[in-house]
Amino acid sequence: MHKIIKNVYKGTKPMQNCLIIINKNAGSSKKISFEKVEKCLGDDYRYKHCTIPDDEIENFSAYDAVAVCGGDGTLASILEKACDMPLKVFYFPVGTLNDKAKAERYSHLKAKCPSCDEEKGKAKPIVVGKCARLIEEDGYITEECDKSLFSYVFAAGSFTPIGYTSDVKEKQKFGALAYVSKVVEEYKPHRIKATIATDKKTYDDEFSLIMFLKSPRCFGFHFNKAYNGESMSGHVLAIRSPKHKGALGYIEMFFPFFRAFFMGLKKERDKGSLIFKKIYSANLTLSEDVDFCKDGEKHVLKKGRYKISFRRSLCDFCVIEKF
């Protein structure tokens, strides 16, 4: 009798629910379709479709998996909802630069297709960055409940507005070239008054760039040669503002940016205008409101004190580039 029951139920699995989200404003969204995603993920799921910006993204509690089709900013917004949930997140990168997907090529998370390449297709938790406002009451410092997550970069200053100011239609038509016209426009020193406190040292200065990073690349440059995808750490890259203003300041800012992004960074550095440190967490104090670029989307940090840290997700994550 036991044998018969075993045979009856052998190989049967309950259908799981999967929400497919396609951002129609993503740079190369025309490459993807609901049919392609369903074909890739297979027959184990019962699918529901959602498009951005037409539909409101619902709570994921009714789903076992979420397929995200968009760019890095789309992924970050979905991870904020899914990070602490026991579900699978399949990322189909159809953005413009797709830096997060390219970063995963340097880890063990990349997959061709979870249904046809089982070994590579096993989704795993990932390490994400977290920015939380610190509040001091009665001598105690606590984190605000409303936290912001980023999948690979959280940065402010020179060049960072390119990620969120480029025109959607231009990105869809010209791809990464849409950013080129913005480079000259955004080549200018910034003077962000801030204090960056790591576990070893505190930097109180004016900065042209402040970047918290969990990636080997950003801006399309593969420069962070110290990247370790499995580690619970990330990096902070800070470039001090030029000492001079005007034309001399523009010339002065060229050298540390060239050193960081074109020559790359393999070891920690604290020399001249350039700071590059491995961190598990760091405190950031801003003297004024600052516009940050969070995975390609604009995110305003109000004047105050914040904690940047890194944590492992509860959800499992997988990049699918071939579909």
Which residues fall in each region the model found?
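Small-residue-rich beta-alpha loop regions that form the catalytic core of phosphotransfer
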Residues: 4, 8-9, 14-174
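Short helix/loop capping segments that flank catalytic or ligand/cofactor-binding pockets
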Residues: 29, 220-221, 293, 318
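Short, well-ordered alpha-helix to beta-strand connector turns
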Residues: 63, 86, 206-207, 233, ...
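Conserved Motif II region of HX4D acyltransferases
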Residues: 74, 210, 296
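Short, isolated positions in well-ordered beta-strands
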Residues: 119, 136, 201-204, 299, ...
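Short polybasic amphipathic segments
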Residues: 126-133, 192-198, 282, 289-292, ...
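ATP/pyrophosphate-binding catalytic subdomain of soluble kinases
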Residues: 142-241
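ATP/nucleoside-binding phosphotransfer catalytic cores, i.e., glycine-rich phosphate-binding loops
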Residues: 229-231, 241-323
